[in-house]
Design a protein with these regions (language model features):
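NAD(P)+-binding Rossmann beta1-loop-alpha1 motif at the extreme N-terminus of oxidoreductases
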Residues: 1-52
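Helix N-cap/beta->alpha junction signal
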Residues: 31, 103-104, 265
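Rossmann-like NAD(P)(H) cofactor-binding subdomain of soluble oxidoreductases
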Residues: 46, 51-136
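Rossmann-fold dinucleotide-binding core
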Residues: 101-181
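Helix-loop-beta segment of a Rossmann-like dinucleotide-binding subdomain
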Residues: 136-146, 194-203, 245-255
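Active-site-proximal catalytic alpha-helix in oxidoreductases
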Residues: 176-219
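NAD(P)-dependent Rossmann-like dehydrogenase/reductase catalytic/cofactor-binding core
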Residues: 212, 216-294
Length: 294
């Protein structure tokens, strides 16, 4: 049995694909009020996978459900992750596996510190999904999941190889460099989509030389943590592949949700400061993005 915590776009995407594959799961929503909202709709989700629309009836419960949890996929926003997992502490079995799908860095270590008896895995996700309404989900970009242990030496769970082909997954024993590279790409794209209120593909033209300056500084931050990357190539490849997409950070802004800015760009700026690096372009980017959120 897999439990999914969080009924946002990513949590629903996991639930939809597990449902289609016939894998036993439960989607944990925030509270009884949210559960009643789903129940009133027959727990139905209209899932557009890019090829067809499917109407699925999801298996949903609340944190108060007493059933034990052995495998938990945490699909909340980074700032909400620790408190959300904490609400399930009485249900977590000794040695439970926690799979953390959060953007950026910082929230994963906070959970690992609070749940020392759990196996902690980090997942770098490149799927794109968004909700035109509460009970609709569009799988906008088919991506990949790279999974690895936060604590070195933790073995992969047995069921990882049993996931359906729709959940493309690989195991990476050293996950931190993967998370750092994704963080750096997010830093180079998402804040600009806030500042200019634009889609990903418009960032190079709007940002101009500022983008290149930020990439160069991010490359230094990665190097200070022993992470190799051709960051400029990766950033422009992502921009090209997601040109028509609205970044998750921009979506949060438009929906008046809290963003994860402090967990990627804020984290990168703090890491640069700790390493004694001068990053004027990134510092300016953070201030401008924060201004855009006000």
């Amino acid at each position: 049995m897999l439990h999914i915590l969080g009924a946002g776009s990513l949590g629903l995407l996991w639930a939809a694909r597990l449902q289609q594959a016939g894998i036993d799961y439960r989607l944990i929503v925030r509270n009884e009020s949210q559960l009643r909202q789903w129940n009133s709709n027959g727990n139905r989700l209209v899932f557009d996978d890019g090829a067809a629309k499917h109407t699925l009836s999801l298996a949903i419960e609340t944190p108060d459900t007493p059933a034990p949890i052995e495998n938990l996929i945490v699909a909340t926003k980074a700032h909400a992750a620790l408190a959300a997992v904490e609400s399930l502490r009485p249900r977590l079995q000794p040695g439970a596996a926690l799979f953390l799908l959060q953007n950026g860095l910082g929230s994963q270590q906070a959970i690992a510190d609070a749940f020392t008896d759990c196996r902690i895995y980090c997942v770098s996700v490149t799927d794109g999904a968004w909700r035109p309404s509460e009970h609709e989900l569009i799988w906008a970009g088919r991506g990949h999941n790279t999974v690895g242990p936060l604590r070195p030496g933790t073995a992969p769970p047995d069921w990882l190889n049993d996931l359906p082909s729709s959940i493309s997954t690989t195991w990476q024993h050293d996950i931190l460099p993967v998370l750092w590279r994704k963080l750096a790409v997010n830093c180079a794209i998402n804040p600009f989509t806030l500042i200019y209120d634009c889609r990903n593909g418009e960032v190079p033209e709007r940002a101009g030389e500022w983008l290149g300056q930020c990439i160069a500084e991010l490359q230094q931050v990665l190097a200070s943590h022993g992470v190799d990357a051709n960051l400029a190539e990766q950033v422009h490849a992502v921009i090209l592949a997601t040109a028509n997409n609205s970044s998750s950070t921009r979506q949060d802004l438009h929906a008046r949700r809290r963003t994860e800015l402090s967990y990627f760009l804020g984290y990168a700026c703090r890491a640069a400061q700790s390493a004694g690096l001068s990053t004027p372009a990134l510092d300016r980017l953070l201030l401008s993005a924060q201004d855009a959120l006000r």
